[in-house]
Structures are given as structure tokens and as C-alpha cells.
Amino acid sequence: MIQEEYKKNEEYMNSTILPKLQEIQREVLKNPSKLTLDISVRNNDGEGYISSFACVRDFAGEITDTCYPRFICVYSKEEMDELINELDEFIKKYSA
């Protein structure tokens, strides 16, 4: 039962979360800003995992704010949606 749920959540990560993250990456690249966005993915023995790290830097290159959502197959779709929205709001805040 648990493995089935992990599999469904991993499919959601592939079909919904990753495309949204790629869309956010394109926006960061398209618009001049002090933002940095890193994304990594892995599958650890059948457990999917996506980590993202966004930060904004000041004129001296010092990090002034961060957002670090992690998407793990044990999270519900609702939890993952909340995290992607948090990242999206962070990016919008510093892209303006």
C-alpha cells in the first residue's frame, strides 16, 4: 500500500512538479535579477526526491534571502503543491 502511494506521488512529481520547476527556471533565466535557482533530482531505492534552492543576492553577492523546498515521494500532492507555490511566490517577489 505504501509503495503504491509513493509510486503515485513520484508520478505526480514527474508529471506536475518537474514541469512547474522548469517553467520557474525559464522565468529566472529570462528576467534579469539577483536570483539563483538550483534544482536536483534523485531516486534512492525507489523513493523519488527533488530538492530546489533559490536565493537572492545583494549588490556585493551576499545571500539576503533563501527558499529551499524539497519534494519527497512521501509528501502528499497537496503538500507538494504548497511547496511549489511557496517557491513561485519567492521568485515573483524578487523578480519584480
Placement of each model-derived feature along the sequence:
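Amphipathic beta-strand/beta-sheet edge segments enriched in Tyr/Trp
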Residues: 50-58
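Negatively charged, low-complexity tracts enriched in Asp/Glu with abundant Ser/Thr
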Residues: 1-47, 63-96
